[in-house]
């Protein structure tokens, strides 16, 4: 499900969700200047990709990592007090599969989740109190 400030594609163009509402049994979203039922055609998630990661400050490390027999490229984002490691595989059933590991303040505190889409990455960042990163992605 989508959340406020998530980025999605609407008719092939990236749009940010600026409001969500429920009326009766239908969910509506507002994408910048467009308001409509979420079930309408045209809204699609954005797949996590290597170009997206590079555009948003992740650095590709020349290291191939294996999880559950799948090969993943390693991307790293470093900032004050935390390290984000994102491992992204080649296509698996039509989708890139990403595995996100966030270490905060050099402690054992971390989140380890599997993701496919940009809005899922945004929501994982928000859960780790990295709202400013989640809400400022470049598409």
Please report, for each region that a protein language model flagged, where it lies by residue.
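Acidic, low-complexity, intrinsically disordered interaction modules
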Residues: 24-34, 38, 62-118
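Intrinsically disordered, low-complexity, charged/polar segments
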Residues: 34-62, 112-128
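Short amphipathic alpha-helical segments with coiled-coil-like heptad repeat character
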Residues: 58-64, 136-139
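Residue-level detector of beta-strand structural context in well-folded domains
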Residues: 6, 51, 56, 73-75
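Charged phosphate-binding loop/patch that engages nucleotide di/tri-phosphates or the phosphate backbone
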Residues: 125, 129-139
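Short beta-strand-centered aromatic/proline hotspots
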Residues: 6, 13-26
């Amino acid at each position: 499900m989508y959340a406020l400030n998530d980025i999605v594609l609407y008719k092939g163009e990236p749009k940010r969700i600026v409001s969500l509402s429920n009326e009766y049994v239908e969910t509506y979203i507002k994408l910048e200047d467009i308001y409509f039922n979420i079930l309408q055609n045209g809204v699609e998630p954005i797949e996590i990709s290597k170009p997206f990661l590079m555009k948003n400050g992740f650095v590709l490390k020349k290291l191939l990592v294996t999880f559950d027999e799948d090969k993943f490229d390693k991307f790293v984002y470093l900032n004050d007090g935390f390290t984000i490691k994102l491992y992204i595989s080649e296509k698996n059933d039509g989708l890139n599969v990403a595995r996100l590991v966030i270490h905060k303040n050099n402690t054992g505190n971390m989140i380890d989740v599997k993701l496919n889409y940009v809005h899922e990455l945004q929501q994982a960042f928000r859960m780790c109190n990295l709202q400013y990163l989640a809400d400022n992605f470049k598409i």
